[in-house]
From Swiss-Prot:
It comes from Eremothecium gossypii (strain ATCC 10895 / CBS 109.51 / FGSC 9923 / NRRL Y-1056). This is Ribosome biogenesis protein SLX9. The gene is SLX9. InterPro entries: Slx9-like. GO terms for biological process: maturation of SSU-rRNA from tricistronic rRNA transcript (SSU-rRNA, 5.8S rRNA, LSU-rRNA); ribosomal small subunit export from nucleus. Involved in ribosome biogenesis. Required for normal pre-rRNA processing in internal transcribed spacer 1 (ITS1). May be involved in the movements of the replication forks. The keyword Nucleus applies.
Amino acid sequence: MVAKKRTQLRAKAMRQRRNSSEAMETEELPPDPKAFLHQLRESKREKQLNRSQSFLNRLRDQAGNGGISKSALRRRKKRMKEELKPRMEDLLTSLKEEGVLEEDESGELAAVTGVTAITASNGYSGLHDTAEACGTVRIRKNEPSIRTQRGAKLLTTKEQERFTKVISNERFRSSPFETLREIIKSRK
């Protein structure tokens, strides 16, 4: 038997490949609608590679700090925070500029009269006989919170006691509206 030439065999193989690739191109199917429904599974080897790669990246990032220790970085951050905080001198100058504080002849700073004065309260210790000056705010300390059940209960009992005191007051019997007005002013 006579052997065929290699060139003829190569040409024949090339023709067959072309025909098969053309057939494959014409037989393309539409994309699978369920292709993205399943979660991609990562093999054990891929997981190990991902972990090692992330660890190496983290090491490179830490090495990129220029050899600065953690404590030095912490001190830098703390210093930057302190620089951002307002200083009392800055606050004083801004209050002067806004007109909230004015200097007297003696050189001391005094609040302008338009600013509300804050006074401490002595709570529910009886009725206040004198009305306070206008523009004051009472600070009530150690009062129960109305938001809690126990606090609301305590506040209602205190209010009931105060109500009975107001009603039993002689001035209330003579002029109720005037007395109520004074009591409301005293609670302000």
